[in-house]
Amino acid sequence: MKKTAIIHIYNFIRMSHTEPSRFLFDDFDTLRRILILVKQYGFPGTYALKYDALMEPRYQALLKEYLDENDELGAWWEITEPLCRRAGVAFHDTHMEEQYDDRVDSAYCLGYAPEDRKKIVDAYMADFYAVYGRYPASIGSWVMDSVTIAYAREAYGVGAACICRDQIATDGFTLWGGWPNGVYFPSRDNAFLPASDRETQLDIPVFRLLGPDPIYNFEANVRSGVMEGVFTMEPAWLPGRDPGFVGSYFDSMTREDALGIQYGQLGQENNFLWENIRPGLEAQLQQMERLVKEGKLRVETMAATAGWFRKQYRLTPPATFQVNSDWSGHGCSAQWYASVNYRLGLLGEEGKLRIRDLFVYPDGYRCRYLNDRIHTRQSLFDAPPVLWPQLWGGKEDRPFIRLVDEHGCEPTGEIVYDAIDEYTARARLLGHAEFVMDQGGFTVTGPYGLKFDRLPVLKEITGREFRLEYEGFAYGFTVARGVIDGLTIRPENGAIRLEFGADPGAVRREETVPVPGLRRSAGRPVPPVPPVATPGDAVLPWGEECYVTLRSRDAGIIRYTLDGTEPTDGSEVYEGPIRLTDDAVLTAVLITPQGAESEVASFCYRFARKDLKLTSPTELDHREVFHGNGLAADLLRTDRGTTDFLDGRWRGSLQDIDVTAEFEPGVIESVRMGFLSHHRSGVVFPKTVELYTGADRDHLVLKEVITMPDGPGDREIERRDAVFGVNGQIGAFRIVARRHKLMPQWCIYRGTPTVFTMTDCLIVRPGEEKA
């Protein structure tokens, strides 16, 4: 089927992630670099401002300088003490100087009475208008209530809203059972769920954030051995920069025979910092650029899509969210179907097709925080469950709804997901059974029954009605076709039919609404993309030569130097691979035919002995990204770690880093070991680094102790080598990096014992042999 595939580049902008807020240059510079990168690819962006960033003049000036009429400014709905004071509302925080995500009862609108929520909206909107001369086009937060969303829409014309993906107990938020991905019209009583009719519907589309993986995002807490990580398109995390996952996600949007609007959100909070955001975001933009040129993808602002959606649909249209193959190689597949009445999650694994998730969307299921504020530090948004494996089981006893024959055995075969028409989708277990999902329910054809492993919400079965109750709320579903046998439903005349609500019929308006388009802009010119070197920062074998190539995304000439100075008009022009035989710092700049210059790119190359035998008792973190092949194998690798702690080149431990090297005796000029500090991620430089040297490992004596920096640096993320002058003949050495026992007081996690020490390499530079 022809499909609509839409991406939003939506970035969450905070001046600070703690209360009270303070200006942090790294966070500010991260936004500047994101703005430039998105503009370099020519895409529109949506930038949602927390109140502290809204009121900071430096952020105001930056956004006014870079944004144009194709971009959108929105509100990021995290509550601060100054915003409450401006609104005349008491700030409820009792956990000052903690991260916002841990304080749902004060830093989010749920922590305030409904009338106070409106006062907070009024205060924010007044200040936003004073700064930008208009109201924000969208409003977003990890969690929001329908009171806030409705008031922002009705009082200030805000056109779109967004909330977090489904997740379990992450950062104080549990959201599970809602629209699995994409966009819907919310209910007035519960913004987490789609409205079933126009009377109960808010006239503002809600988007789900972060681009969840249709397979593994929904396997949280129920799959043994599942890969660790955050399974979203967030570029600061491993899946979001994994080419396999990113490619699979875009394929699910553009190549799958899926139903309805295929949607993804890219972007990240600026407090994750540029060094960790850039590797993933740039790779995602590169793939997007190709898909846009092929006409397969629309890149829009959130409010632009919302305006189109509101004109095109009278009710939320059904949608599927699916992948027929597994990017991770584990052999799974998944399909989600959602309508105004229910959502159904199907999982394919080892040839078995199972229902893994089923929630219903009945009228009357109100949000817990509709009429009262939250009084705990953990929030919960959900829907009435028919199958909630995370709540009713776990990794060892996970429940499904299974296809079974008369002996209780599950069939196996090839699994295929597709769409039949704009309202109906299908999942086939070829040669055995077929699920057909429509807006009112689903039908299973074939000789197999449906067996519920567990249904703790069951109150009674009356005729064809399963009557259920969850937290005092009564609901249920109808077996319109099938023979009920306890918790198994057998086929009736070759089929089973479950219904969850009335089919609303056609939800698309008859007229076709034109899609939003980009406008010509006289916005600020952005610099071209800097040159890239291959290899990047590297440690090369002593006595050999290396050739470095430079390439650029944009047309122009590249000028470079090899002594670390910035290139000038008189510097060498790059014409081919650069030959290196000794240490060098390569700096390069791209100059376009129009005379625009990129930022200067810098790359460091060192030559060192590689014939070392390394041993280490240090236990590394078990995660592959921090463990690799171990210290002994990886400290002599060629490529150096970057300022991105997830680049796979840093070896991390909660122990002291302790490494002994043995080699053919010779004169050694220096020994250096590389370290990383990124305290927001729990990584700091070691307290001290000790070097022991000797003729062999049995005769080592203390040579020197280096005290590493212990305090905020010029940049939040820093690399630094501990460099020891040896200048003598040795055959062995030992380096011990002593970690802090507790995180230092200047760190965000001050006083906690989980102090990571990270190292990337050992560099042993030979000296000159005396005659």
List each language-model region with its residue ranges.
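Active-site beta->alpha N-cap acidic-glycine motif
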Residues: 1-69, 262-265, 334-340, 345
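Catalytic grooves of carbohydrate-active enzymes
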Residues: 12-22, 29-41, 126-135, 191-305
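Metal-dependent polysaccharide deacetylase catalytic core of the NodB/CE4 family, i.e.
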Residues: 52-143, 199-231, 259-272
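Catalytic domains of cell-wall/extracellular-matrix polysaccharide-remodeling enzymes
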Residues: 113-188
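Acidic-aromatic substrate-binding/catalytic surfaces of carbohydrate-active enzymes
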Residues: 346-424, 430-431
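Low-complexity, disordered linker/stalk regions enriched in Pro/Thr/Ser/Gly
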Residues: 520-630, 634, 639
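Disordered, acidic Ser/Thr/Pro-rich linker "stalks" and the adjacent N-terminal cap
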Residues: 523-529, 534, 601-665, 676-685, ...
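Trp- and acidic/polar-enriched beta-sheet ligand-binding modules for extracellular glycan
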Residues: 655, 679-771
